[in-house]
Amino acid sequence: MSPLPSFLTSPPPSVGVEITSDRVTAVSLSRQASGWIVSAHGTERLTSGVVTPGLNAVNVHDARALSAALRSAFDKLGARPRRVALVIPDTAAKLSLLRFDKIPAAAELDQLIRWQMRKAAPFKPEDAQISWVPAAALPGGGREFLVTLARRDIIESYMRACADAGAQAGVVDLASLNLINAALASGDTTAGDWLVVHVAPDYVTLAIVRDKEVIFFRTRQLEGDADLADLVHQTAMYHEDRLSGATFARVVLSGASARGADAPADAAEKHARLRRGLEERMGVKVDALDFRGIAAMRDRISAGPDLLDALAPAVGVVLRERVA
């Protein structure tokens, strides 16, 4: 699989950071003889209104509060990082799959992709930040391309918050893409198509992966658990009718424990309830995304779903450049 798209790249950092509408999380990974280790992590809550993710509106409303939360999370790592890989909410950007039945020449491909995305952007073309990678091959020699579009000033506002906290963001990426990175890096070899369900505080993203390539990606606002079950059912029907799919070989759920839960016990129950509801609706086993197959937790025998959910995107963005 080609690396999933990133807005900005440079040599990979060993610290991943995720910013959501209600918290910031920092994770430090280290390489040991036994493999990758989550050597430290820290989370700080954000008060309502500090960050409100969106494609075409101000996202960071209180830069000082966001930077302070990032500094507090960095302090919990033991040493403040100078460089980080940054994960931002899916709703801060637009991700599309562009299809070319005949792949243009390399000199034209980038221009065509950028032209198509800028044409559909709800803001001035010159304000667009665009990143793309090859995705699934098509019969007859064509290919899909996974393209991410965002407003440049929105991306820069998240990066600036990190810089004000003392860390440069060498990589900027989306949350759900890095859940996929974490799942792929964990080495599951299940044959067939699989579904990733990412439940954030204010949205849900559904992604379908086939042969390690994203073939479907949809982000929607989420009002309640019933809406989630309906969206998953609709996605399963689309998968069968339009993508020539059968029953999903694997369904991975992440983030459910953080939605509406105020304590670890609440988080575990929330995750279990959503998982059972999806299993009943789909008739398929639903697993929590567990990255510990590739990055073990240091000095921790077990980790609850709330912790795994909180760390997974930041772990995924660190592993994306390090695990084939």
Model feature map: region roles:
Residues 1-324:
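Hydrophobic/aromatic-enriched cytosolic interaction surfaces used to assemble or bind macromolecules
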